[in-house]
Amino acid sequence: MASSGNGTTAGTGSPCGACKFLRRKCASDCIFAPYFSSEQGAARFAAIHKVFGASNVSKLLLNVPIHDRCEAVVTIAYEAQARLHDPVYGCVSHIFALQQQVAFLQSQVMQMKAQIAGHQTSAAGDLRHSSESTNQFMTWQQTSVSPIGSAYSTPYNHHQPYYGHVNPNNPVSPQSSLEESFSNTSSDVTTTANVRETHHQTGGGVYGHDGIGFHEGYPNKKRSVSYCSSDLGELQALALRMMKN
């Protein structure tokens, strides 16, 4: 696109593309020579001339600083091509299409941000629910007690002795409990001895003549029962004396 100072393309002596299209002699100070080459400038300048006119473009470039004229020529050529492609909107149609694309992309960005926020909120809610469930489970473990363990860990069982079935309206002392125990034992032994003696006299066992029980041939049974009763009486008397002391 560069041309020599005399208005002709360097090394060829041909006019610039604009002058070639206009079929005129290219002057040394041609304003179009630096921007329209002799080979490809004619077709490019044709669209500009058809839309804006050569004289109008020349006046426009004269009002633009030299260091900005190249960019001005590029934009003028773009506007001319857009106007030929779309006589109604020209380059505005391209601008409108780009604006629609920007708006569509912005809406997609907003949707993605909303989805991300929703996922973050859901994740935070799940984490909070999991934490609350864990805390409730740990609290339940700390406060819950096994029924068997509680039955054997009460203060009463640790510190209170067991005296059998005690009536709260009639408390029993250890001495009276021991006396009752010896009395029950003595009465049981006496009852057993009487039963054995009765069946021994009748000639049969505990369950009759043919049953299983204490049969004849054991004359020392009554004697051993008497010894046992006397021993229990002595033990009972000794225990009572020890408790009184």
From Swiss-Prot:
It comes from the Eukaryota. It is found in: Nucleus. One of its GO terms (biological process) is positive regulation of DNA-templated transcription. InterPro entries: LOB (IPR004883). Expressed in roots and faintly in shoots. It holds the Pfam family LOB. Residues 14-116 form the LOB domain. GO terms for cellular component: nucleus. One of its GO terms (molecular function) is promoter-specific chromatin binding. Disruption phenotype: Reduced number of lateral roots. Induction: By auxin. Keywords: Nucleus. Residues 162-183 are annotated as: Disordered. Homodimer and heterodimer with LBD18. Transcriptional activator. Involved in lateral root formation. Regulated by the transcriptional activators ARF7 and ARF19. Functions in the initiation and emergence of lateral roots, in conjunction with LBD18, downstream of ARF7 and ARF19. Acts downstream of the auxin influx carriers AUX1 and LAX1 in the regulation of lateral root initiation and development. Belongs to the LOB domain-containing protein family. This is LOB domain-containing protein 16. It comes from Arabidopsis thaliana (Mouse-ear cress).
